[in-house]
């Protein structure tokens, strides 16, 4: 997988923890979890769109799928 860039994820971790260092392993672990969760949500959203007779996933599908 590994499609999300690490830098923004590291910034998110640092912002959440204050003045703390973040290991590359921690950043990679969070990236992997976020990508996995994103795929799960996207798959559920696609099912919702198909069920509604649409070929386009809308923001409302994503919100319902989360």
Question: What are the residue ranges of the model-derived segments?
Answer:
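Histone-fold and other basic nucleic-acid-binding segments
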Residues: 1-66
């Amino acid at each position: 997988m590994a499609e999300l860039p690490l830098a923004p994820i590291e910034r998110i971790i640092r912002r959440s923890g204050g003045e703390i260092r973040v290991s590359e392993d921690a950043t990679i672990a969070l990236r992997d979890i976020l990508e996995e969760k994103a795929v799960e949500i996207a798959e559920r959203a696609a099912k919702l769109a198909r069920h509604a007779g649409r070929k386009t996933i809308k923001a409302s599908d994503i919100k319902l799928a989360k």
